[in-house]
Curated annotation (Swiss-Prot):
Gene that produces this protein: dsrF
Organism: Leuconostoc mesenteroides
Pfam families noted in UniProt: Glyco_hydro_70
Residues spanning the membrane: none
Function: Involved in the production of dextran, an extracellular glucan polymer.
Entry annotated with the keyword Transferase: yes
SUPFAM superfamilies: (Trans)glycosidases (SSF51445)
A GO term for molecular function: glucosyltransferase activity
Gene Ontology biological-process entries: glucan biosynthetic process
Protein name: Dextransucrase 1
Length: 284
């Protein structure tokens, strides 16, 4: 069991002011994180076929296996992912890729959340205008070489697609809160739906530019974007190292003042700000 951990520089460029410039991958990660809140729950199955295409399915809450029929809540949850890292992927005629969405999702409409195009990726935040496919009587979504093929572009080297049920409410939350889950072991971490609902965000880069005014301090910008982190489902936020940099230039980390030099000292920004802000910005 693992908890997803998203890195700042996957979403924003390392250089420049904090959160000022989005990376080429921002839209994809933004779409996936929001969808994780809305759809991801229940049991999981993963497999790799003879074409080295990986499929991963989450069945939705109250369904741990493909044979579970679940509840009405299960019906609008769950997600199917298709991944290949082969830019030359070409399925032979008659070959298919199947997402076994499970018995809870028989004869159901699914829509693309994210799909590969010749030029990059297409994103669909709602049911409107999204490509639609239907599961069969076994709950299978079946795709042919008409829709699955390898590409090479700045967004994708291979193939990527994500499918979710049609008809989910925009404010649907498939996560499980920790305070609703009973733990009976003496372990620190418990493998359950509550742990599965966690997301860690490493929210800083060692190489970002120095702030030119107080509005650009990392800790100020983080507070201003709290709603966005909530939409992403972030439950643990790894802040930048709140250290007073030595600035003695004897070591790379003291030159870029990232808080990792040998003589740096922990300081939230008392008196004068650190690279990341003043103590009042942390308190806010």
């Amino acid at each position: 069991d693992t908890v997803p951990r998203v890195y700042y520089a996957d979403l924003y460029t390392d250089d420049g002011q904090y959160m000022a410039t989005k990376s080429p991958f921002f839209d994809a990660i933004n779409t996936l994180l929001k969808a994780r809140v809305q759809y991801v729950a229940g049991g999981q199955s993963m497999s790799v076929d003879s074409n080295d295409v990986l499929t991963s399915v989450r069945y939705g809450k109250n369904a741990m296996t493909a044979s579970d029929t679940g509840t009405s809540e299960t019906r609008t949850e769950g997600v199917g992912v298709i991944v290949s890292n082969n830019a030359e992927l070409q399925l032979e005629d008659g070959h298919t890729v199947t997402l076994h969405m499970g018995a809870a999702h028989k004869n159901q409409a699914y829509r693309a959340l994210l799909s590969t195009t010749a030029d990059g990726l297409a994103y669909y935040d709602t049911d409107e205008n999204a490509p639609v496919a239907y599961t069969d009587a076994n709950g299978d979504l079946i795709f042919t070489n008409e829709s699955i093929y390898g590409v090479q572009n700045p967004q994708v080297s291979g193939y990527l697609a994500v499918w979710v049920p049609v008809g989910a409410q925009q404010d649907q939350d498939a996560r499980t809160a920790s305070d609703t889950t009973t733990n009976t072991s003496d372990k620190v971490f418990h493998s359950n739906a509550a742990l599965d609902s966690q997301v860690i965000y490493e929210g800083f880069s060692n190489f970002q530019a120095f702030a030119t005014d107080s509005s650009e301090y990392t800790n100020v910008v983080i507070a201003q974007n709290a709603d966005q982190f909530k939409q992403w489902g972030v439950t643990s936020f790894q802040l930048a190292p709140q250290y007073r940099s030595s600035t003695d230039t004897s070591f790379l980390d003291s030159i870029i003042q990232n808080g990792y030099a040998f003589t740096d000292r922990y300081d939230l920004g008392y008196g004068t700000p650190t690279q990341y802000g003043a103590v009042d910005h942390v308190r806010a």
